[in-house]
From Swiss-Prot:
Enzyme Commission identifier(s): 2.5.1.78
Lineage, opening ranks: Bacteria, Pseudomonadati, Campylobacterota, Epsilonproteobacteria, Campylobacterales
Organism in which the protein naturally occurs: Sulfurospirillum multivorans (Dehalospirillum multivorans)
The protein's name in its UniProt record: 6,7-dimethyl-8-ribityllumazine synthase
Catalytic reaction equation(s): (2S)-2-hydroxy-3-oxobutyl phosphate + 5-amino-6-(D-ribitylamino)uracil = 6,7-dimethyl-8-(1-D-ribityl)lumazine + phosphate + 2 H2O + H(+)
Active-site residues, as the UniProt record annotates them: 89
Keyword annotations: Riboflavin biosynthesis, Transferase
NCBIfam families the record matches: lumazine-synth
Length: 156
């Protein structure tokens, strides 16, 4: 049996965008730092990495659609933080950003990673943005890197 899987290395020419929601920026800025660190550690070049800022997580799918449609990027890493409050707003935003990113990703043959935190508290967000639970931005970019390699292997 042949096994096809992606590798965790870049050749340096891959053009990657990070979409980052500014809302809850204390958390999302740390996710961006983690994603950038992963990209550079695995062979990416800083000049091939773009950061696209959107107001909040709800706007991520719209920006993702534009980025993938323009053919400038090989992959996109989506980052944000939706923290539960006392209203149903959390449920609506979490569901729509998740469905939106999935729907857009399926329209294009390019790697997309979902690094949007959906958490019950600011403490959980902090844990996932670089403390106890690692940095989910780093993990999302590692997913992008592996998918870039996998997509390349599947083309050949």
């Amino acid at each position: 049996m042949n096994i096809v899987e992606g590798k965790l290395s870049l050749n340096g020419d891959e053009k990657v965008a990070i979409i980052n929601a500014r809302f809850n920026h204390i958390i999302t800025d740390r996710l961006v730092e983690g994603a950038r660190d992963a990209y550079l550690r695995h062979g990416g070049k800083d000049e091939n990495l773009d950061l696209v800022l959107v107001p909040g997580a709800f706007e991520i799918p719209m920006a993702l659609n534009r980025l993938l449609a323009c053919s400038k990027y090989d992959a996109v890493c989506c980052l944000g933080a939706v923290i539960r409050g006392s209203t149903p707003h959390f449920d609506y935003v979490s569901a729509e950003v998740t469905k939106g990113v999935a729907n857009v990703a399926l329209q294009f043959a390019k790697p997309v990673a979902f690094g949007v935190l959906t958490v019950d508290s600011i403490e959980q967000a902090i844990e996932r943005a670089g403390s106890k639970a690692g940095n989910k931005g780093f993990e999302a970019m590692v997913t992008v890197i592996e998918l870039l390699s996998l997509y390349s292997a599947l083309k050949n």
